[in-house]
Amino acid sequence: MGTKTHNSRGKIFMIYLILVSLSLLGLILPFKPLFRITSPSSTLRIDLPSPQVNKNPKWLRLIRNYLPEKRIQVGFLNIDEKERESYEARGPLVLKNIHVPLDHIPKNVTWKSLYPEWINEEASTCPEIPLPQPEGSDANVDVIVARVPCDGWSANKGLRDVFRLQVNLAAANLAVQSGLRTVNQAVYVVFIGSCGPMHEIFPCDERVMRVEDYWVYKPYLPRLKQKLLMPVGSCQIAPSFAQFGQEAWRPKHEDNLASKAVTALPRRLRVAYVTVLHSSEAYVCGAIALAQSIRQSGSHKDMILLHDHTITNKSLIGLSAAGWNLRLIDRIRSPFSQKDSYNEWNYSKLRVWQVTDYDKLVFIDADFIILKKLDHLFYYPQLSASGNDKVLFNSGIMVLEPSACMFKDLMEKSFKIESYNGGDQGFLNEIFVWWHRLSKRVNTMKYFDEKNHRRHDLPENVEGLHYLGLKPWVCYRDYDCNWDISERRVFASDSVHEKWWKVYDKMSEQLKGYCGLNKNMEKRIEKWRRIAKNNSLPDRHWEIEVRDPRKTNLLVQ
């Protein structure tokens, strides 16, 4: 009996083991091994599962709620092949992922070649920056995803990089091409990179959001179209009246696009001339003469003058009578300037970006006069200016577009970016590295080096005069007092001096009263006349008999 019981228990245990083994085998068989050894002597080969394509990448999650109710096409720019799968989107929302190739920029195309110091304004050419030309359905996308090059980027200076410019222009080109094909089609551009896009092409007003290194924009296509009309640098004079469809980058055979020409200004804009006075009244006379010269040229555009508390009520009355609409501002100190230096408060000029009740402004320094009507400048985009030296522009006259977010950006960057000259010009050149060249006729600087300007005269086709050195109203009208000071003779010209006084002569007696001489001004003039006489300066201007009536009618201080 005991033996039977023992055998029975053994059978039950064996059956239990078999059932457990079968259960474990059933669990193991459905799983495939992650690797296998192909032969005893071969190298170990590991077959890993294929990476899963990201069906809902971050850029899509960010803009999903902005997309139209249709299947979208996505264009990718500057996305490395190894990264493509992680950025591509799949699913019912996406019709097609299109990777747009970028041709290499020739090695001889550098930033200096795009921004030469001097050009022949009548016959200049620019290097070519190749832009992609998608054809057919590939040229019509709803979203552009572009990785922006950030090599060399720093928060302390501007980034002048031709590859970065190419990617930004390519994104703009593709957006405009797509927007032409469907009326009122919105195109979104997503930039990936810590430095973000070039704000000269994609301004902050068009930014939908920024999340870490993702920058989402909904560009205003008429403005973007005009950007693409501009030369790729200051290597050519920017056109003011241009038609879309005639850009250098557009193939001539695309007649269907060229027929959709629009003027550079898509709608009626509110525009104005603007200048700034701060810290002293030294330029009140200059601002009055500037306003009068604008009116004498035939322009009837609005004129805005920003001023701080240092401008007296008496001067404000004269400025208003000259034609300026007055607005009080608080000064802005240049963060890197020395205390009590001449440029300590020059960043006050940045306040012009706060004049947001206007779409476009032409800023002009108060030591300018206008000789020919300059209203055509309002057709230029931000930032347009005349060249200064090297790759830099002169901020004495510039076309800009007011913007609250741009002003905020300028303020934030003013504490990080140090100006090369301590003033606004050096700072703005680090902000707007991609600018558009105006003719030197618009900003003809009163400067004469002995090598090129021995006669100290200017051509007759000058449209705007920028008075460097001692200003005409602090000299006798009889001659340019820059002649009396050796180191200032590069600014001296009697013929250019006379042009300012022609504007003065057409002013009312009330306005002329703001341009008089006081006793201290006369003493300074006479001091340098004596020094010039003692040094026997060869031009002998110190011998000229002074007949300026202001000399005998000095202002009471």
Curated annotation (Swiss-Prot):
Keywords: Cell wall biogenesis/degradation, Glycosyltransferase, Golgi apparatus, Manganese, Membrane, Metal-binding, Signal-anchor, Transferase, Transmembrane, Transmembrane helix. Substrate binds at residues 365-367, 394-396, 421-425, 466-471. One of its GO terms (cellular component) is Golgi apparatus. It is found in: Golgi apparatus membrane. One of its GO terms (biological process) is cell wall organization. The keyword Ribosomal protein does not apply. SUPFAM superfamilies: Nucleotide-diphospho-sugar transferases. One of its GO terms (molecular function) is glucuronosyltransferase activity. The keyword Transmembrane applies. Mn(2+) binds at D365, D367, H466. Its cofactor is Mn(2+). The chain crosses the membrane at residues 11-31. It comes from the Eukaryota. Its EC number is 2.4.1.-. It is a single-pass type II membrane protein. The record marks K349 as: Important for catalytic activity. Gene3D superfamilies: Spore Coat Polysaccharide Biosynthesis Protein SpsA, Chain A. Belongs to the glycosyltransferase 8 family. Glycogenin subfamily. May be involved in the substitutions of the xylan backbone in stem glucuronoxylan. This is Putative UDP-glucuronate:xylan alpha-glucuronosyltransferase 4. It comes from Arabidopsis thaliana (Mouse-ear cress). The gene is GUX4.
